[in-house]
Amino acid sequence: MADKLIIFDTTLRDGEQSPGASMTKEEKIRIAKQLERMKVDVIEAGFAASSNGDFDAIHTIAGMIKDSTICSLARANDKDIQRAADALKPADHFRIHTFIATSPLHMEKKLRMSPEQVLEQAKLAVRFARKFTNDVEFSPEDGSRSDMDFLCRVLEAVIAEGATTINIADTVGYGVPELYGNLVKTLRERIPNSDKAVFSVHCHNDLGMAVANSLAGVKIGGARQVECTINGLGERAGNTSLEEIVMAVRTRKDYFGLDLGIDTTQIVPASKLVSQITGFVVQPNKAVVGANAFAHASGIHQDGVLKARDTYEIMRAEDVGWTANKIVLGKLSGRNAFKQRLQELGISLDSESELNLAFQRFKELADRKAEIFDEDIIAIVTEESAEAQEKEHYKFVSLSQHSETGERPHARIVFSVEGKEVVGEANGNGPVDATLNAIETEVGSGSELLLYSVNAITTGTQAQGEVTVRLSKAGRIVNGVGTDPDIVAASAKAYISALNRLYAGADKLNPQRADI
């Protein structure tokens, strides 16, 4: 029987560290439920000591998720570890993931600790974590740039203290496949008690090699856990992509010889959910989940695929969750048909009132758009959830615009502030600029617009536009997403969504970063 590769997803922790990717508690819960449906082995739900918001999200997820192990990150100190244990209490089974830097650069410049102090701190941290659970993971931060002899000493010591998973972190994406794979291999060979722990890999994509390095850690090094995120989400250039790891190991089982517990048909739904919640659009040529991943433009390729799919396709689109039947509903579709499609898409709404509200939005969209696609339905539910969690301090009501060739466009927008309607009017260099200016005449947020992007959710001129707006204020960066067949209205909704996140803090109260 083949060994099993453990999939450890850190979308909710490391992925969320992408600038603008902060998620509300409700959004984290929706992603956690989707990860559970995908049968992810371990879900790192956050960093409990970083903020009250993260603690609350972890605590709630720990009580809801039953089929995946829930994990919280903690620095190598008693306060962080106690906070993680408290957040994880509702879980049937949980993991504490503690870490400390081990590279000379980090020990000297960041920690200002000697190697012996770091060694002792690592031992104490694992010993304390074992008081709460027998599932303890230890990561040597910046492990790929650490001294080999010292790294071996630290890892041997923490395994002796009870660490059951050892995670070799390529924190800055410095590794290359052969060297990183051999690093993991050497550690497993040199550490006398290495057989007492599962070795794990955690790679960043700064040089574009996160997936390659992770696979080398598995094949060459013998690692049996990969830490990854949906869509490769993460700060800087991102993290190891879950979908690429899973499909590489599944498609090339002849080479890797490993089993997986993942339901791969849930990969694309997870990708779309994370993209629409965070506003980080998946590039069309992204492996596995990109819109063009299974598209064939070459006539020779098309002819081959029509004759036999395996001539040019090494995996089937339906195996990762792409559906051939795109048009699902129209304005004559009833509530039961809508509810059934939600279930087929793996979308779970918590109450009848939420279902009724989503169905109302669906009917409103169907009156304006003849064909409703899966992506439209996901967008409806995602936007509904975001508005509910944002408490709608600001709420879009209506928009009118006037534009003639040679004249500056004028916009008039009606929106509510804590339930009281206000009207903003302004001119701009285009209809979108005029609309956002009109909002600011009443809000005066003082924020800076860092990003404005438009993406068509589906195909055709009737497609809904999905607009992502990224705002910065006082060091905080937030994303807002809005959808509407009218691009200008979608822009207004996205801007208001971002303002709500700035106002609410997006569940982040004095957050602290954690780099592994």
Swiss-Prot record:
<feature type="region of interest" description="Regulatory domain">
    <location>
        <begin position="395"/>
        <end position="516"/>
    </location>
</feature>
<comment type="similarity">
    <text>Belongs to the alpha-IPM synthase/homocitrate synthase family. LeuA type 1 subfamily.</text>
</comment>
<comment type="pathway">
    <text>Amino-acid biosynthesis; L-leucine biosynthesis; L-leucine from 3-methyl-2-oxobutanoate: step 1/4.</text>
</comment>
<dbReference type="Pfam" id="PF08502">
    <property type="entry name" value="LeuA_dimer"/>
</dbReference>
<keyword id="KW-0479">Metal-binding</keyword>
<protein>
    <recommendedName>
        <fullName>2-isopropylmalate synthase</fullName>
        <ecNumber>2.3.3.13</ecNumber>
    </recommendedName>
</protein>
<dbReference type="InterPro" id="IPR036230">
    <property type="entry name" value="LeuA_allosteric_dom_sf"/>
</dbReference>
<feature type="domain" description="Pyruvate carboxyltransferase">
    <location>
        <begin position="5"/>
        <end position="268"/>
    </location>
</feature>
<keyword id="KW-0100">Branched-chain amino acid biosynthesis</keyword>
<feature type="binding site">
    <location>
        <position position="202"/>
    </location>
    <ligand>
        <name>Mn(2+)</name>
    </ligand>
</feature>
<dbReference type="Pfam" id="PF00682">
    <property type="entry name" value="HMGL-like"/>
</dbReference>
<dbReference type="GO" id="GO:0003852">
    <property type="term" value="F:2-isopropylmalate synthase activity"/>
</dbReference>
<comment type="subunit">
    <text>Homodimer.</text>
</comment>
<dbReference type="GO" id="GO:0003985">
    <property type="term" value="F:acetyl-CoA C-acetyltransferase activity"/>
</dbReference>
<dbReference type="GO" id="GO:0030145">
    <property type="term" value="F:manganese ion binding"/>
</dbReference>
<keyword id="KW-0028">Amino-acid biosynthesis</keyword>
<comment type="function">
    <text>Catalyzes the condensation of the acetyl group of acetyl-CoA with 3-methyl-2-oxobutanoate (2-ketoisovalerate) to form 3-carboxy-3-hydroxy-4-methylpentanoate (2-isopropylmalate).</text>
</comment>
<feature type="binding site">
    <location>
        <position position="14"/>
    </location>
    <ligand>
        <name>Mn(2+)</name>
    </ligand>
</feature>
<dbReference type="InterPro" id="IPR054691">
    <property type="entry name" value="LeuA/HCS_post-cat"/>
</dbReference>
<dbReference type="GO" id="GO:0005829">
    <property type="term" value="C:cytosol"/>
</dbReference>
<dbReference type="InterPro" id="IPR050073">
    <property type="entry name" value="2-IPM_HCS-like"/>
</dbReference>
<dbReference type="InterPro" id="IPR013785">
    <property type="entry name" value="Aldolase_TIM"/>
</dbReference>
<keyword id="KW-0432">Leucine biosynthesis</keyword>
<dbReference type="InterPro" id="IPR000891">
    <property type="entry name" value="PYR_CT"/>
</dbReference>
<dbReference type="InterPro" id="IPR002034">
    <property type="entry name" value="AIPM/Hcit_synth_CS"/>
</dbReference>
<dbReference type="InterPro" id="IPR005671">
    <property type="entry name" value="LeuA_bact_synth"/>
</dbReference>
<keyword id="KW-0464">Manganese</keyword>
<feature type="binding site">
    <location>
        <position position="239"/>
    </location>
    <ligand>
        <name>Mn(2+)</name>
    </ligand>
</feature>
<dbReference type="GO" id="GO:0009098">
    <property type="term" value="P:L-leucine biosynthetic process"/>
</dbReference>
<feature type="binding site">
    <location>
        <position position="204"/>
    </location>
    <ligand>
        <name>Mn(2+)</name>
    </ligand>
</feature>
<dbReference type="InterPro" id="IPR013709">
    <property type="entry name" value="2-isopropylmalate_synth_dimer"/>
</dbReference>
<dbReference type="Pfam" id="PF22617">
    <property type="entry name" value="HCS_D2"/>
</dbReference>
<keyword id="KW-0808">Transferase</keyword>
<keyword id="KW-0963">Cytoplasm</keyword>
